[in-house]
Swiss-Prot record:
Protein name (record): 3-hydroxydecanoyl-[acyl-carrier-protein] dehydratase
The species this protein was found in: Agrobacterium fabrum (strain C58 / ATCC 33970)
InterPro entries: FabA, FabA_FabZ, HotDog_dom_sf
Gene Ontology CC: cytoplasm
GO MF term (any one): trans-2-decenoyl-acyl-carrier-protein isomerase activity
Main location: cytoplasm
Subcellular localization(s) per the UniProt record: Cytoplasm
Record keyword Isomerase present: yes
Active site, UniProt feature: H71
The family this protein is said to belong to: Belongs to the thioester dehydratase family. FabA subfamily.
Any one biological process term the GO annotation gives: unsaturated fatty acid biosynthetic process
Reactions that this protein is recorded to catalyse: a (3R)-hydroxyacyl-[ACP] = a (2E)-enoyl-[ACP] + H2O; (3R)-hydroxydecanoyl-[ACP] = (2E)-decenoyl-[ACP] + H2O; (2E)-decenoyl-[ACP] = (3Z)-decenoyl-[ACP]
Lineage of origin: Bacteria, Pseudomonadati, Pseudomonadota, Alphaproteobacteria, Hyphomicrobiales
Length: 171
């Protein structure tokens, strides 16, 4: 496994998508176009809203992003599920960053609130993930609350994001 850093650039995040950052069979981000993170600006095992660790990350929005022409024609909006998936991606990344082993999977979320939209004129998305707990058992389970800001305004909030790492072999 790579040395734990406090931030990651785009190339380092892509290496996680290729399965190189945390080692084969361990936490892995999706590759573009499903990758919803361009930079991890800060990651820590302590601090955050619950003092159990946090991640702060960013995604640069482009009017040319793949989802705008199809969602919806004449009214382009980034699907809210992509922002939620970005929160799950970061929750799983945190578990791999802690050194936990296994393949990641989004499991659930308690509540999601959408208060705004990402449109082609949006420039920057910022993520905040604050960890409540990490449980280690048959699978490693991370639970966190998250938010997404579009150009500085909080537009999504999610509570009890849950991501697990399982050591089961891939199909």
């Amino acid at each position: 496994m790579a040395t734990r850093q406090s931030s990651y650039n785009y190339e380092e995040i892509l290496s996680c998508g290729r399965g190189e950052l945390f080692g084969p069979g361990n936490a892995q981000l999706p590759l573009p176009p499903m990758l919803m993170v361009h930079r991890i600006t800060e990651i820590s095992e302590t601090g955050g809203a619950f003092d159990k660790g946090f991640i702060r990350a960013e995604y640069d929005v482009s009017p040319d992003d793949w989802y705008f022409p199809c969602h919806f024609q004449g009214n382009p909006i980034m699907p809210g599920c992509l922002g939620l998936d970005g929160m799950w991606q970061l929750t799983g990344f945190f578990l791999g960053w802690l050194g936990e082993e296994g393949r990641g999977m989004a499991l659930s979320t308690g509540e999601v609130k959408f208060k705004g939209m990402v449109r082609p004129n949006t420039k920057l998305l910022q993520y905040g993930i604050d960890f409540k707990r990490v449980m280690r058992g048959r699978l490693v389970l991370g639970t966190a609350d998250g938010w997404l800001k579009a150009d500085g305004e909080t537009i999504y909030q999610a509570s009890d994001l849950r991501v697990g790492l399982s050591k089961e072999k891939a199909a």
